[in-house]
């Protein structure tokens, strides 16, 4: 399912309304959009990614100075959160993240130490796992155990679509062959369905689904 936007960030810039000011405004808009588009901000609780949504231009007179006009623009970025979650006593989401972290040279959000401000380049692949849904399992519960079915979304992000797609293929093949991965208590998570859609956005939606 598509996630909601977690918030927005707006940057306002303005220059004196003349030929040089207008040129400076156009250049500043390009620089700021490039600087913040696709940037990740991380603290101890969550990671946020910024995605440019729109730029709105304006022209107005400075209050109290009727002969001074400025031209400017407001750049709006959507913020998507990648928060830490813990699903105890059995954490399928964290266990899949750990499995990925241990088997591939990728950056796993909330499983890897990250800088406060960073942006994946063409060589780096970034992965985030989250719980999409949970239902009672198809097997009947017993006194020894209770079964649940989890849908886990995997977000795969990179500056290179080729590298992101290659990792997705490797991940799907690995899980398809193993048919399981180890949970945090040592028990297996049995995978019964894998899905990959190129129509889904890796930041908003997560284009890989692991069901089991």
Regions found by a protein language model. Give the residues of each.
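A short glycine-rich, His/Asp/Glu-containing loop-to-beta-strand
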Residues: 125-128
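Charged, amphipathic alpha-helical segments and their flanking helix caps
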Residues: 2-121, 132-212
């Amino acid at each position: 399912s598509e996630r909601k936007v977690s918030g927005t960030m707006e940057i306002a810039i303005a220059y004196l309304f003349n030929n040089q000011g207008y040129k400076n405004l156009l250049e500043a808009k390009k620089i700021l959009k490039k600087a913040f588009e696709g940037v990740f901000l991380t603290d101890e609780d969550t990671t946020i990614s910024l995605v440019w949504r729109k730029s709105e231009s304006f022209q107005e007179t400075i209050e109290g100075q009727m002969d001074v006009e400025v031209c400017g623009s407001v750049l709006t970025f959507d913020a998507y959160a990648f928060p830490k979650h813990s699903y105890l006593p059995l954490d399928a989401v964290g266990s899949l993240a750990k499995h990925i972290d241990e088997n591939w040279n990728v950056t796993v959000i909330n499983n890897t130490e990250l800088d406060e401000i960073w942006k994946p380049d063409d060589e780096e692949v970034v992965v985030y796992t989250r719980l999409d849904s949970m239902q009672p399992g198809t097997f009947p519960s017993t006194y020894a155990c209770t079964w649940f079915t989890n849908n886990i979304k995997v977000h795969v992000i990179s500056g290179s679509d080729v590298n992101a797609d290659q990792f997705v293929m490797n991940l799907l093949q690995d899980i398809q062959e193993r048919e399981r991965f180890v949970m945090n208590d040592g028990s297996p998570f049995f995978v019964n369905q894998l899905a990959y859609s190129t129509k889904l956005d890796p930041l908003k939606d997560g284009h890989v689904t692991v069901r089991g």
